[in-house]
Design a protein with these regions (language model features):
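Internal helix-loop-helix
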Residues: 68-162, 207-209, 423, 514, ...
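A glycine-rich, basic-preceded beta-loop-alpha segment at the flavin cofactor/substrate interface
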Residues: 103, 241-246, 250, 255, ...
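Flexible, glycine/threonine-enriched loop-and-boundary segments that flank and lead into catalytic domains
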Residues: 167-213, 370-386, 390-406, 482-486
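C-terminal helix-coil-helix/basic helical segment that borders enzyme active sites and/or dimer interfaces
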Residues: 344-381, 478-490, 508-512
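Alpha-helix capping/hinge segments and adjacent helical runs
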Residues: 6, 13, 18-50, 374-453, ...
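Extended, charge-enriched "interface" segments that sit outside catalytic cores
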Residues: 1-104, 465
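C-terminal amphipathic alpha-helical interaction region
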Residues: 453-551
Length: 551
């Protein structure tokens, strides 16, 4: 009989500390839900994820009579994952009145805490969960009362029989990151919110392709070019009379990873949709969903890193080679401490973003906090996406040949990780977005302010090293601002700035961080990414690894 694994919520002290700080008095009410998710993800969820990956969705275009149906046939394991994720309240945590006492004033903290645990088991279906949250968010913020009443309760449902899932259809053949090239046309209407239009065009990369409620960009007839001419529409899969809407799923993609859910190509042939925001508003509204997706992407990245650390440590504690456990071999001890340290810092940094989103969403955030969230979001997404791929690759290597075999989880974890630096903006696109925030909203000012404040709460050695590196970053930014052809160096600058932000956040006692273990991990990451000299001065111990990973 297989031994039941410890709940991933119970085994990560840093996560419990962060959620306790952000949820406040609601934490005790939320704990049973978090414990259940952590237990389910570590056990049944991990098994279902493996099964769903190996038994991906299948598109059925026609029924036995030849009628077009465009339905997706899911393996039973995916349905079980839906029950764990949606039924466990990931989306409901933000919107469903039944969970109000558990979330308090920190709906996103509870959503992301649950989601982080779920993503350790299944990063794939975490994408549809994210899209469902994003659709609900846009409807709550910008939808008419009629649209809100029709869709939001079902997007926030924990009952699969009433659940609607969401999606975001942006990408076309001619434009991925270049959204201004969108050629899908909206016909009819006069710009009144909630009005019905007909959509014509093609969408090329549509994740959760059979979603019930789809946010979609299109250009109204006669509207101008670029993103300013785009409107945002709500596209239902099924019309109010129960009939299929007029769009076709042409095929589903054969993806490297995230194979449990369908990403497809869609043709719109007069599909009915409802206006959410017209030209001048639509793209900016969609950007709100995109930024939420970027925060989800960061949380998924930390989840992938955590799973990689857990699997690597579990193996290293058991495997004996050359007369001792492999965790006791110095080179592997160093590798494991690097992995655990990066994952711990990633967790603390990502939940800094979650805290800011909750604060800004509640309406109590200052202009400084809004600007901080704007600057932090693209950095979180791109840095942690890259870290996730590296840490997952190290995890595969720790397991050696077993890590490379699909019977074990790490091969899937690595395949799933590779999409994290890609969707919601590739690394270079996000660097450019960070520089837009820097130029238009003084993003560098809030970044420097946070780094300086948090560094002042760090031990003197960290404070001194960060101060020197921050001065270097400030001087480099002046150079960049004086060179109109300096775009080639933007990524170097943002990598360094993000490193300093990550390290100092871990040391910030004002955020509830700054424990001895947090600081140990921060020193480790700082020394690795901004080394002084060729050879490391500190030596990792097995106890260091266990402490950073679990205490």
């Amino acid at each position: 009989m297989t031994t039941r694994k410890q709940s991933w919520f119970e085994s990560e002290a840093a996560l419990k500390r962060v959620l306790s700080a952000q949820l406040g008095a609601a934490f005790e009410k939320a704990k049973p839900r978090l414990e259940k998710m952590g237990d389910g993800a570590a056990n049944e969820g991990a098994r279902w994820a493996q099964e769903a990956d190996h038994n991906g969705p299948k598109l059925i275009n026609f029924d036995h009579t030849g009628a077009r149906i465009d339905e997706i046939d899911y393996h039973h394991s995916y349905k079980a994952l839906q029950q764990l994720g949606y039924g466990g309240g990931i989306v409901a945590a933000t919107y469903n009145p039944a969970l109000a006492a558990e979330r308090g004033t920190a709906g996103k903290a509870l959503t992301m805490g649950l989601g982080y645990l779920f993503a350790q088991a299944e990063a794939g279906m975490f994408c549809p969960v994210c899209m469902t949250d994003g659709a609900a968010r846009l409807l709550v913020k910008h939808g008419t009362k009629t649209l809100q009443e029709r869709f939001v309760p079902r997007l926030a449902s924990t009952d699969l029989s009433t659940l609607y899932t969401g999606a975001m259809f942006l990408t076309e053949k001619a434009g991925g990151s270049d959204v201004g090239q969108v050629s899908t046309v909206a016909k009819g209407g006069n710009g009144t919110p909630g009005e019905t239009v007909k959509l014509f065009g093609d969408k090329w990369f549509c994740s959760n392709v059979d979603a019930d409620v789809i946010m979609i960009l299109a250009r109204p007839e006669g509207a101008g070019p670029g993103t300013r001419g785009l409107g945002l529409y709500v596209l239902p899969r099924t019309l109010e009379n129960g009939q299929r809407n007029a769009f076709r799923i042409d095929r589903i993609k054969d993806k490297l990873g995230e194979r449990s859910f369908p990403t497809g190509e869609v043709t719109l042939d007069g599909a009915e949709a409802y206006l959410l925001g017209g030209p001048g508003q639509g793209f900016h509204q969609m950007a709100e969903m995109l930024n939420l997706s970027r925060l989800y992407n960061a949380i998924a990245s930390v989840g992938v890193m955590r799973r990689s650390v857990v699997e690597a440590l579990d193996w290293a504690e058991q495997r004996v080679a050359f007369g001792k456990k492999v965790i006791e071999h110095p080179l592997l001890t160093e590798t494991l401490l690097d992995m655990a340290s990066e994952q711990r810092l990633a967790l603390l940094w990502a939940f800094r973003g979650v805290k800011l989103m909750d604060t800004v969403d509640a309406g109590g955030g200052s202009e400084q906090e809004r600007r901080t969230l704007r600057m932090l979001t693209p950095l979180l997404k791109y840095v942690l996406g890259k870290w996730a791929v590296r840490v997952a690759s190290e995890g595969v290597e720790v397991l050696a040949g077993n890590g490379y075999i699909e019977d074990w989880p790490m091969a899937r974890v690595l395949r799933d990780a590779q999409v994290l630096p890609i969707w919601e903006g590739t690394t270079n696109i996000l660097v450019l977005d960070a520089f837009r925030a820097l130029r238009k909203e003084g993003g560098h000012e809030v970044l420097f302010a946070e780094v300086e404040k948090f560094a002042s709460e760090a031990p003197s050695d960290v404070q001194s090293r960060v101060s020197a590196l921050l001065d270097e970053a400030k001087h480099a930014l002046v150079e960049l601002s004086q060179d109109p052809k300096a775009e080639h160096a933007f990524r170097d600058w943002t990598d360094r700035a993000a490193l300093l932000w990550t390290v100092t956040t871990a040391c910030a006692k004002s955020l509830g961080n700054g424990s001895d273990t947090d600081v140990r991990a921060a020193r480790r990451v700082l020394a690795r990414h901004a080394p002084v000299g060729l050879l490391r001065k500190d030596r990792a111990t097995v106890d260091d690894v266990r402490a950073v990973a679990f205490r």
